[in-house]
From Swiss-Prot:
The active site is at S103 (nucleophile), H128. The gene is clpP. Fourteen ClpP subunits assemble into 2 heptameric rings which stack back to back to give a disk-like structure with a central cavity, resembling the structure of eukaryotic proteasomes. This is ATP-dependent Clp protease proteolytic subunit. It comes from the Bacteria. It catalyses: Hydrolysis of proteins to small peptides in the presence of ATP and magnesium. alpha-casein is the usual test substrate. In the absence of ATP, only oligopeptides shorter than five residues are hydrolyzed (such as succinyl-Leu-Tyr-|-NHMec, and Leu-Tyr-Leu-|-Tyr-Trp, in which cleavage of the -Tyr-|-Leu- and -Tyr-|-Trp bonds also occurs). It comes from Vibrio parahaemolyticus serotype O3:K6 (strain RIMD 2210633). GO terms for biological process: protein quality control for misfolded or incompletely synthesized proteins. Belongs to the peptidase S14 family. It is an enzyme of class 3 (hydrolase). Pfam families: CLP_protease. Transmembrane segments: none annotated.
Amino acid sequence: MSPIMDALVPMVVEQTSRGERSYDIYSRLLKERVIFLTGQVEDHMANLVVAQLLFLESENPDKDIFLYINSPGGSVTAGMSIYDTMQFIKPNVSTVCMGQACSMGAFLLAGGAAGKRYVLPNSRVMIHQPLGGFQGQASDIQIHAQEILTIKQKLNNLLAEHTGQPLEVIERDTDRDNFMSAEQAVEYGIVDAVLSHRGA
């Protein structure tokens, strides 16, 4: 976060038996097993999310973790480090889309624990094929193009597994940017339900 954004993060003061204790709002929510994945998916952000997932597993391996996503997407390798950790750890990771989950954000949303993937009513979800850019010698460009196709196949297979859609449907629907409303994301199988109100 930038210094300006750091200054804008609210602090929460708690009374304890030893006096007052103050936390930034994200640290306080981490105590409630809530992690925020916001903005571009990149290596630094992915490392922070992975560290929080591992920490919460060590705190209580049997209690669900809640991952709130508002992301336009980003790096496939950074996203896969988060995805693999979500699948690896013992606690179920419940995913919640607020705002948008596009590209790798949508993939991580779908990768939450089955039956525990949610979207807020006015959020949007977008899936597409991975993007890549490379310049250099023709032979190196060919190597990188083949790697992008391999990654595309892997992501499509995993998305088919998490959504229950046939692979050929995933391949067709990710060929171009494919935007979905909250209800369409439920119908497609990326999430399990639209959350409009917190339960009583």
